[in-house]
Swiss-Prot record:
One of its GO terms (cellular component) is cytosolic large ribosomal subunit. It comes from Ehrlichia ruminantium (strain Welgevonden). The gene is rplS. The keyword Ribonucleoprotein applies. This is Large ribosomal subunit protein bL19. HAMAP family: Ribosomal_bL19.
Length: 125
């Protein structure tokens, strides 16, 4: 039974992964563009925030973004293979030492900043 479920999940991932999914980790700043369906119809909305956690679980993979707007912390959990997602873009690579940044939930202002990670492999001569 588990093999059947595994095959089904792999088929669904192939169907839903028609867009480019960049490599990112927690601490990276992401810009997610998604379709929002409401009573007026369909519109496109972008959400830019720091990735607090990433959960890799096949078809049910997800990540949580956090941003501060008007002194209020806003969190958004996004499923990686959701059909409502238009694009995922990495704005900045963060340098952190943990996989889950739950300590960031209580931080605001300058204390919530994350250092930028410099990729040494793409160093120009």
């Amino acid at each position: 039974m588990s093999n059947l479920l595994k095959e089904f999940n792999e088929q669904q991932i192939k169907l839903l992964s028609n867009r480019e999914i960049p490599k990112f980790k927690s601490g990276d700043t992401l810009r997610v563009t998604m379709k929002i369906f409401d009573s007026a119809g369909e519109r496109i909305q972008t959400f830019e925030g720091v990735c607090i956690k990433r959960r890799n679980n096949g078809l049910h993979s997800s990540f949580t973004l956090r941003k501060i707007s008007y002194n209020e912390s806003i969190q958004l959990q996004v499923f990686l293979y959701s059909p409502t997602i238009e694009s995922i873009e990495v704005v900045k690579f963060g340098k952190v030492r943990r996989a889950k940044l739950y300590y960031m939930l209580s931080l605001f202002g300058k204390s919530a900043r994350i250092k930028e990670r410099i990729d040494r492999s793409k160093k120009s001569s």
